[in-house]
């Protein structure tokens, strides 16, 4: 399955909450149906991107990066690359690359959508990132570090997040914590939630860029 086909299938089968999330799902689907190149970074003025919100196993801390160009705290994420085979794979690759963490337990189902304008992405002008967000767990205390795209990577308590964090980031964090809480079963790992059907991927599992 191509990356474009995977993105269409994931969004077609995803059940968003009513309101803005449902509207964004339709917006993203219309874009992909109209543009076979809709995931390419050269698709102007809109293209689909993917990201991941990383939480500690007890869900009380979130790992964020201080973006070098935007100078704001974000979840991890970015553009699709030629070697990517799925949207969840894009999110996982970006999460591993930008966090410096060796492995993440990824929920393969989208958790949140967001559309945002970016002024520094394309020399032709402002582009809109149609961002499909996933969520993952990483062990608290695991080694991490900033990539060339970030100024800092840091764990933040969910009740003491960076000042000025955007409303959509608060929505993403809340939605991700709710998703993991709902996934807890009697067969979950001791000490924290685990997805039924989720998977832990190491950096070595990812295609080269």
Tell where the protein language model's regions lie, with residue ranges.
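Short, well-ordered beta-strand micro-motif
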Residues: 54, 135-137, 157
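Intrinsically disordered, low-complexity terminal tails and inter-domain linkers enriched
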Residues: 182-208
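N-terminal strand-loop-strand
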Residues: 39-75
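Active-site segment of metal-dependent pyrophosphate-handling enzymes
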Residues: 100-142
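NUDIX/MutT-family hydrolases
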Residues: 133, 144-175
